[in-house]
Structures are given as structure tokens and as C-alpha cells.
Amino acid sequence: MFDKIFWVMKMKKLLLCILSLMLCLNTSVIHAKEPESLMIVAHPDDETIWGGSHLINGNYTVLCITNGNNKKRKKEFMNVMEKTHSKGIILSFPDKTKGKRDNWKSCKKDIQREIQKEIDSKDWDKIVTHNPDGEYGHIHHKKVSKYVTMILEKEDKTNQLVYFGKYASKKNKAELENEKKLSKKDYKEKLDVIQLYSSQSKVMDHLHHMLPYENWKPYSNWGKIE
């Protein structure tokens, strides 16, 4: 009798494992059918804050410029890549040096070379990055946006370039009234991914009002009043 119960329990576990594997494979196949796009961000978490729902529902390679030498941040980033079925590349250019935000003067050309290498590695459907304002003005966001834009303008590929959406501060969030929000389902899925960035809880709290919005803008429409 005991052997029979034990056998039934083992079979149930096996079936659950098979179903789980089939679900993962099915999700991966769906992602693989989407045209492949490239997202380029300054820090681990930027890809999720400004484009998490796109990652979940699309087929992306994400190039992150900083924190590849930070074990915690790198692990969080790679966990997000796994969760969203994305390919992640995380470099180790400086985020902060001696407690202060690095100005990238010493590594500007190296960063540009790495960005160009990834841009030229495939014929991407879209190349997505920080907007020229750096969202809320972060200097690294602005620099990444500038480098990506400069390369794509030089290569005459700006038709592929897409920027993260406009930012509004908490006190000015009324500016977002006419912006389209993510569906409840997509927003919930995005929040589930956000949880993987436990080290960035303060950042997520500060930018929480922006999480329901991912209204990206093509290069050709940036700055136009709609």
C-alpha cells in the first residue's frame, strides 16, 4: 500500500515537471518567433523600469554598460534575463568611482566601441535605448542615448532607433494623464520581474509612478508634440 502511494506521488511530481518544462519551451518558442531587437541600457534595472513589459512580450538582447563586476547587481540582471527569456550582456564599465558617479571620460571610446560592436552584430528589428533627456536626467542615461544615436546616425540606421518614453516627476504626474497604461495583466507581470531587483527597492519606490508606462518613441518622433 505504502509503495503504491509513493509511486503515485512520484508520478504526480514527474507530470508537474513535464508540464512546467512544456510551458517554458512554449514561451521560448513564442519569443523566438518575434523579430529580434536590441536594448542598450546604462544600469541593471533600467531595462525593466523602462521596458520590462516589452522584454516579457518580445525577443530582446539587452546590452548593459555597467555593474558586470558587481556580483549582486549582475546576478539580479541575469535572473531578469532568464525570467523574461531575454539574452543579457553585462559589461563592467564604472557606475560609481570612490562613491561618486563616474563621468566615463576615461572609457568613453571603449563604451562606444562595445555599443557599436553589438549594433553591428546583427540586423536588428529595433534598437531601443534611453531617451535624449536621460529620462529623469541621469548623466549615464544621456551618454548612452547620445552614443547610440550618434552611431546609428552615422550608419544611416535611425529608422531602427526607438527611445524610452517621456518621464514625469511624482509632483508632475498629472502630465501622464493622457499616456496609455499597460494592461493589468502586463503590469502585474512587470511587477513580478521588478521583485527580482531586491537591491534596488529604493529606486523602484522612487520611480514606481512610472512603472505602468512604456510609451516608447521612435527617433523620428522624439520631441514632437502629439
Where are these regions (language model features)?
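Short, Lys/Arg-enriched N-terminal segments with co-localized hydrophobic residues
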Residues: 1-10
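N-terminal Sec-pathway targeting helices
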Residues: 12-14
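General helical structural elements
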Residues: 16-17, 77
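Bacterial N-terminal signal peptides
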Residues: 17-24
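Cleavable N-terminal signal peptides
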Residues: 20, 29-30
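Active-site rim/loop-helix segments in enzyme catalytic domains that contact anionic ligands
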Residues: 30-122, 149-158
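Metal-dependent de-N-acetylase/amidase catalytic core
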Residues: 32-37, 58, 107-226
